[in-house]
Each structure stands twice: as structure tokens, then as C-alpha cells.
Amino acid sequence: MAKVLVVYHSGTGNTKAMAQAVAEGVKEVPGVEVVLKEADQVSVSDLVNADAVAFGSPTYFSYMAGVIKAIFDKAYLSRSQLKGKPFGAFASGGGGEVKSVQSIENIAASCGLYKVCEGVAVGGMPTESDSQDCRKLGTTLAKASKK
């Protein structure tokens, strides 16, 4: 069974709500398991063992949270094992969340991961429309994980 790892950090609960919506989207695809983990609980082996990964972060100074960046720092030496693995990104914030998504996408690509969908950037608490975008991200990743 294919596995999608949803990694997130959330300070206020907004990014957690987005992560849960991404996980719901993954569950819509038969034959795919979803693993939802807070960033400080994620190891490099979690990334290597997943068939696809979603990264979610709050926005700090138009950038991803340090705990998300730390995952990439640890994973960089294992990038050969991550090469071509599908990923997607999502972020929440009170400004700069598009840049936060872009920062995740850029560093994930440098670790060899392959972007399969547009990131989701949300200002504040996700609306139903935002949650739908997150579910779509999850569904897209789930389908990509089976290839």
C-alpha cells in the first residue's frame, strides 16, 4: 500500500487544520495510507519510507518555520533516496504565506523531491474553500504516490 506522509508545524492551529484537510484528501484515494505527523516527530527515515510527502508550515518572516527547515537540513544528506519523490506544500500566516510555500518548494526540490501540485497558501484560519484546496493537494499526492 502506498503511503503519504503529511508533516506539519502549527503554532495557532491554522496549519494543523490545513494538515488535517490534506490527510482527508489522501484518504479519498483507495489503496493509500496517510501518516499525519508533527514536524518535531519526523525522522529522515519517515521521509525515505513515504511514497509522497506534504509539508505544512506557519509563516515566520515570509519563510517556513525553523522546525520544518531542520527536517530538510537533516534530509539533505539522504537526498539520493528522496530523488523523484512527489511532494506538495502548504502554509498559513498573516502575510508572506506565498513566499513561505515557495521556500518549502525550493528547498524540497534541492533535496531531490518532485513538485506535483501547486502549493496552498492561506491567510489566517482556513475557510471551507481553503480546506477544499488542501484536500485536493492530498488527493493529488495520493494519486502520485501510487505511480
Residue spans for each PLM region:
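FMN-binding flavodoxin-like domain, especially the glycine-rich phosphate-binding loop
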Residues: 2-4, 14-17, 21-31, 35-45, ...
